[in-house]
Each structure stands twice: as structure tokens, then as C-alpha cells.
Amino acid sequence: MTAKKDDTLSPQITTAGDTRRLEFNGTDIAGVTAEPLTPPDHVVYRWLEFSDFEDWAAVANWAVDLFNAGETQSADFKSAAAAINTKSTPEERAVAALEFVQSQIRYFSIALGESSHKPTQPDIVLQRRFGDCKDKALLLVALLKQAGIKSSPVLLSTTRRKGLDQSIPSPSDFDH
């Protein structure tokens, strides 16, 4: 577990069996009022972060395992891949794959349980004809692979523009 520490407030640590308890107490802590429209990168409140990830490489490895499309075998997938592969150049195939995912798969998110972070397999997305950003990204990567185009999904934050290097390693920093 990695912890980023604010040295102005130290925990009282107690241990009972396999459980370690950190208790933080503060008195006379000044209140903070955030200004309207403050950029999300500028955090004015105190907070405490914990992570099970030792470094950013561990976060990347966690994500790589989630974004494994396996072998896509459905007739829908084979049909979409065949249509994309009728294009002559890699650029045309990439555009065709992107246009297919954008126009044929509705955006709909069911972010409950494992679906909050693990993409649905491409065959299921094609059968349902809907998926969230993760689902559509994994489908696009699988279609591009069938078109002979190497690609990889990436994690990103739509709200944080900077400061990631000052966060503790955690997938919670990403929302897409």
C-alpha cells in the first residue's frame, strides 16, 4: 500500500491481528472556501489518499489485464471486420473502424460493480449494439487488430489536465 502523507497531521496507529488502524485527529483546523470555477487541478481541501499500487507501472499492468479482448469469434464481429478490410490502405481501414464504432454502437454506460472499470468483450458489445467508452475502445482495438493495425487503449482523465505526477499511483485518477 502506498500513502501520500501530509506531515502536519500525524496518525495514531494501532494494530489488532492483521488490521492496522490509522486515526487522524485535528483541532482548530481552519475552514476553506473554494472559489467558483476553480480548475479541477487546483485542490484547496485537505484529503488523505491510499493506494494498493506501488507505482504507475503497476496501474498500467492492472489496466492491460482488463483490456484483453481475447479472440472475437461472433458473426457480427467477422462481418464488421470483413467490411473494414475491404479498404485498401491502413488509413482507410482505421477510419472505417472508427466510423463503425462511432455510428453503429450507441454510448450507454452501466457502471456497476466490475463494469465500472472492466470493459465488456467486443462480441457482447456488438450483440447489444451499445457500450460505454471502455467497451467501445476495446471493440475499436479488436477491429483495428483484425485490420492489421497495431493500437492500444489508454487511460485518461477528462478533468485533470496536470498534476498526475504528484498523485499516488491509482486507477481512480482516470475517468476514461
Tell me what each language-model feature is.
Residues 17, 74, 90, 94, ...:
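Active-site-proximal structural scaffolding
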Residues 76-79, 113-123, 157-162:
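Short, conserved phosphate-binding/catalytic loop or strand-edge motifs used
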Residues 91-94, 123-124, 152-154, 164:
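Contiguous, function-dense segments enriched for cysteine-driven chemistry
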Residues 97-101, 133, 144:
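Conserved hydrophobic/aromatic pocket- or pore-lining residues that grip, position, or stack substrates
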